[in-house]
């Protein structure tokens, strides 16, 4: 019975309450913080679980009263209100029972790179960045460009941005992969539709505790930063390239005039990429056959097509087609895509957990 699956969560919540009131725990700040965090994570589930149990018990009691001459009609009326509540509560609880992704509340580095399609691909990087920026604005998040490499005809060959706010990774983690665009470029005189692509990486930001990179594991090169077309824009060696020797991961930052600032930015990105690389290994070892493997690593996997002539957006992983491309791109109404992706991921997780 579903009720029986709920009891361990309620028991653990009550156990934490007892532990938090014990003098031993009160004197151990780290343990107290850890337990408080666990309890606050369980609270929404326990609240729904108690409501589910109360509702199920009330249904059982009213069913027993159906044959009663005096109370039968009242019991029937109560049941008509209570019975539809149970399946709805069960679905809500199942979502809360899904093991939480420890990275969901983290800020991210968003990395966009031009792929096949030359100049048109670089222009699309700028368009997609604007789409994410507008969505971030709606969500109350803060966007800061970390590094850019300009395209020869506008746009960006590469753009790295930091996005900070509540639940950023939980909303954007399914964006990683290849995004394909089909449209008529401004330079096209015959009106032919061209296809180009960009890759998107969504990397959770990490702190020093999560990733420990030793100084002797990093090789640093400095060079003069260059602008569009390769001309030098700085007379000092302010650009920084960091190489993580154990993994071969390379990060180059040249946006700041100060070498020190570029190094700090590069180190932050490097730590996040090393963390993501470790995360990817774990995912490869443990992930099932889910369509929505987060950051499935294969950046070549085509996840979405943006067809401008038809105003159509298609997400190939879940078979979602929307004829609202202008709304998504110009207004940042990415919820139209993100909400179905999250719902699909939750359904897969519920099935995988056997709930």
Swiss-Prot record:
ATP-binding keyword on record: no
PROSITE patterns for the chain: RF_PROK_I (PS00745)
Modified-residue entries (N5-methylglutamine), positions: 231
Keyword flag Protein biosynthesis: yes
Keywords, comma-separated and alphabetical: Cytoplasm, Methylation, Protein biosynthesis
Subcellular location: Cytoplasm
Alphabetized NCBIfam families for the sequence: prfA, PRK00591.1
PANTHER family: LD18447P (PTHR43804:SF7)
Family designation: Belongs to the prokaryotic/mitochondrial release factor family.
Function, in words: Peptide chain release factor 1 directs the termination of translation in response to the peptide chain termination codons UAG and UAA.
The name this protein goes by in its record: Peptide chain release factor 1
């Amino acid at each position: 019975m579903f009720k029986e699956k709920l009891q361990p969560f309620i028991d653990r919540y009550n156990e934490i309450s007892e532990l938090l009131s014990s003098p031993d725990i009160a004197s151990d700040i780290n343990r107290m913080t850890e337990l408080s965090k666990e309890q606050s994570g369980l609270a929404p589930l326990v609240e729904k679980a108690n409501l589910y149990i109360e509702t199920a018990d009330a249904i059982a009691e009213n069913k027993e009263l159906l044959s009663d001459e005096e109370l039968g009609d009242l019991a029937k009326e109560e049941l008509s209100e209570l019975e539809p509540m149970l399946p709805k509560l069960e679905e809500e609880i199942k979502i809360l029972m899904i093991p939480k992704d420890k990275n969901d509340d983290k800020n991210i580095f968003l990395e966009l790179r031009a792929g096949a399609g030359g100049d048109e691909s670089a222009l699309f990087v700028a368009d997609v960045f604007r789409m994410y920026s507008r969505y971030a604005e709606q969500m109350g998040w803060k966007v800061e460009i970390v590094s850019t490499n300009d395209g020869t005809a506008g746009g960006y060959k590469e753009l790295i941005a930091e996005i900070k706010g509540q639940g950023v990774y939980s909303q954007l983690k399914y964006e990683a992969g290849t995004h394909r665009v089909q449209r008529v470029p401004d330079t096209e005189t015959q009106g032919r539709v061209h296809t180009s692509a960009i890759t998107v990486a969504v990397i959770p930001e990490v702190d020093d505790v999560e990733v420990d990179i030793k100084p002797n594991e990093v090789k640093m090169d400095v060079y003069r930063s260059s602008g569009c077309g390769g001309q030098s824009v700085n007379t000092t060696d302010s650009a920084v390239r960091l190489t993580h020797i154990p993994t071969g991961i390379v990060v180059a930052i040249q946006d700041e005039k100060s070498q020190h600032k570029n190094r700090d930015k590069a180190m932050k990105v490097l730590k996040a990429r090393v963390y993501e690389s470790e995360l990817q290994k774990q995912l490869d070892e443990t992930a099932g056959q889910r369509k929505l493997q987060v950051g499935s690593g294969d950046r070549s996997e085509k996840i979405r097509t943006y067809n401008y002539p038809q105003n159509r957006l298609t997400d190939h992983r879940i078979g979602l087609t929307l004829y609202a491309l202008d709304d998504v791109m110009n207004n940042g109404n990415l919820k139209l895509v993100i909400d179905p992706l999250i719902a699909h991921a939750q359904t897969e997780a519920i099935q995988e957990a056997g709930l």
